[in-house]
Amino acid sequence: MEKQRYERPLIKKLESNMPNKFGTRTEYLPMTHIENVAVKDLIKEHGSPLFVISERAIRNNMRKAKKAFENRYPKVQFAWSYKTNYMDAVCRTFHQEGSWAEVVSGFEFDKALNNQVEGSKIIFNGPDKSEDDLRKAVAHNALIHIDHLDELYSLQEIAKEANKKARVAIRVNMDTGIYPMWDRFGFNYENGQAWDALNKIMRYENMVLVGLHTHIGTFMLSPNAYAIAAGKLADLAIGIKDKYQHEIQYIDMGGGFASKNNLKGSFLPGIDTNPTIDDFAEAITSTLINSNFPPDKLPLLILETGRALIDDTANLLGTVISNKRLSDGRRTTILDIGVNILFTSFWYDHKITPAQAFTHHTEDTVVYGPLCMNIDVIRENVNLPLMNKGDHVVIQSVGAYNMTQWMQFITLRPRIVMIDMEGNVHVIRESETLDRLLELERVPKHLEKFEL
C-alpha cells in the first residue's frame, strides 16, 4: 500500500453548493478539451506550460466584428494591431480575413512586410519612428500617423529627399469624458494643437493628408466615449474641407475595445458587464452617419481592434506543482505558470479551470506561479476545487499582450500551438532553449575561464 503524505489537520470551511457573493452557486465543470483536442494530450506532446490558440475563434471573432460595423456603415476596414499579438500565424489569420496591419515600431513594420502585407496597407503609429523607419515607410507608401511636430518636420525632409508624397494622418487626443486622458500621444483637439499640425501639413508639398486618427485608451468600457471622439474627428474633417477644400479619405478610431476578461476590482464578471462589439459599432457609426458629411462622401472607417478580437481565442495550459498552507491558514496552489508568461495577471482576474474531474468541495485559494518573487501571483483569491500535484489547469482568455510582453525571467518561454479549423495542432512558436538564448550573448576573452 502506497504511503500517504501527511498534512497537518486544519479546521477550514469548505464550500459545496453554497451561494457566492452574487447569490448564485460557484459551479465548475472541468475543461478537458480545447477545440475537441484533449488537454492532457496537448500537454503530453508539447509540454507544460503551453499556449493554445484557436484559429476558429479568431476567424469567428473577426467576422462578427466586421458584421457589426458593416451592417451599420458602408465603408469599413480593420487593421490588425501587431503589438497585441504578433505571432505570424495569428497575424496571417487576420490578414486572410481582410485586415490590414497596424504597427508601432520599425520591428513591427518589418514583421508586417515579412507577412506579405503591402506597404500601402500598413498603418504606422507610435511616437518613436526613427529616420530610417520613416524612409522605409515613405518608400513603401505606408500610411504614416504623425505623433508630434519633431516627427512631422523629419518626415517632411525625408519625403522631400525621396521626391515622394508621404501619405499622412495626425493622431488627435481629446477629452472624451474618460480620465486620465491619453494626451501624451498626438495633438490635442481642445487647445488647437491639432489644427496647428494640420495647417503645417497642408502647406507642405511632399505630404498629402489622407486621414485623421485617434486612440482614446485601453480596455475602454464606455461606447459613448467613442461617440464623442468620432464626433470631434468628424468636425475636424469637415473643417479641413471648409478651409482647404480638401477631403480626407478615412477616419481611424484606433482600438481599445474591452474584451470579456475580468478587471481586478470589478464586482461583476466582464462577460456580463463589458460592452459588446455591437455597442461600440453603434456608438461610432451612428455618430459619423449623423454628422455633416454628405451621405455619398462618408470617409472610410478604420478600426485597429486588438484585445477584443484575440483575448478569448487563447488558453494557457499548466500543471499544479504543489499545495500548501500560508501562516494564516489560507490554501495556496502553486502552478508552473508565472507572471513572466502571464503578464495580464497583473490586471485581470483570469478564470482558472481544472482540466480533469475533481471533488465538488471548493475553497478560497491563492494561486502562485513558480518564480522566486513575491509578486508572482496569478490569482490573489479564487474559489477553486481541491487539486493535487500533477493535475492540469486551463487559464482562459490569454490571447492579448501575453505573447508580446512575456519574458524569460527565471523560466524559459514555452511553446505556442494553434488548432486549425479541422482540429489539427500546429506548433507556431517553439519553446526556448538555453542554446537559443546563448546565441545572442558574447563573453569577453578574459572572462572565459575561472576557478572556484
Each model region followed by its residue ranges:
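Conserved, mostly hydrophobic/aromatic
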Residues: I58, K83, S105, A137, ...
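Short acidic, glycine/serine/threonine-rich loops at helix termini
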Residues: C91, N114, L134-V138, L155-I158, ...
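Active-site beta-loop-alpha junctions enriched in small/polar residues
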Residues: S81-M87, G106-F107, P127-K129, D147-E151, ...
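A charged N-terminal "starter" segment
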Residues: M1-I146, L152-K165, Y204, V208, ...
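Structured core elements
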Residues: W100, I123, H145, A169-R171, ...
